[in-house]
């Protein structure tokens, strides 16, 4: 199914089959959402994960480092803030922080105002790593979107934001 000039993608084939088997069923929603799901899986698996692997990271670890980096100096957040910003489970977050700490990309430090708390801080090595990885990551995303004109990209972004707001609000 990697042929770029194929006339039908998997979602179109499934929708055509449903129209044949269940003509009473509106298959358009399955077709559109199916394309979104397949596209997301392909982007992560075939385009983004190879970037993460190149830098010795997993997807969730990249997210943690990127979240710390975009938080600005001193590039440190509580584990709870990281959990909320990345939508990773608290147990999953602990495992990621442990791996990143072991690799030297982050360190746990005492919270400056809460004696009971800790912060997860980006190390100099982690900052350098995420800066390098981000450059390749953004270029990869730019390449993906290059299939669309600038106006199409803006329209896609607006429509996806609208759908996301709707689904999050339900």
Predicted regions and their residues:
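Exposed, interaction-prone assembly regions rather than primary DNA-binding/catalytic cores
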Residues: 152-170
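A structural signal for well-ordered alpha-helices, especially hydrophobic packing surfaces
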Residues: 40, 130, 164-167
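Charged, amphipathic alpha-helical coiled-coil/dimerization segments
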Residues: 96-158
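N-terminal leader segment of winged-helix/HTH proteins
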Residues: 1-55
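Amphipathic alpha-helical interaction segments
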Residues: 31-38, 63, 155-158
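N-terminal helix-turn-helix DNA-binding core of bacterial DNA-binding proteins
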Residues: 27, 37, 41-89
């Amino acid at each position: 199914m990697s042929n770029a000039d194929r006339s039908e993608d998997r979602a179109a084939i499934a929708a055509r089959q449903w129209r044949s088997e269940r003509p009473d069923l509106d298959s358009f929603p399955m077709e559109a959402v199916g394309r979104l799901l397949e596209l997301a899986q392909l982007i992560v698996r075939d385009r983004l994960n190879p970037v993460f692997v190149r830098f010795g990271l997993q997807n969730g670890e990249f997210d943690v480092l990127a979240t710390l980096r975009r938080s600005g100096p001193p590039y440190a957040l509580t584990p709870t803030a990281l959990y909320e910003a990345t939508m990773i489970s608290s147990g999953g977050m602990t495992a990621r922080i442990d791996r990143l700490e072991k690799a030297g990309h982050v360190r746990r430090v005492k919270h400056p105002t809460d004696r009971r708390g800790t912060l997860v801080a980006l190390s100099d090595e982690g900052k350098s790593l995420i800066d390098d990885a981000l450059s390749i990551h953004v270029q990869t995303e730019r390449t993906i979107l290059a299939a669309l004109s600038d106006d199409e990209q803006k329209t896609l972004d607006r429509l996806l934001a609208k759908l996301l707001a709707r689904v999050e609000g339900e």
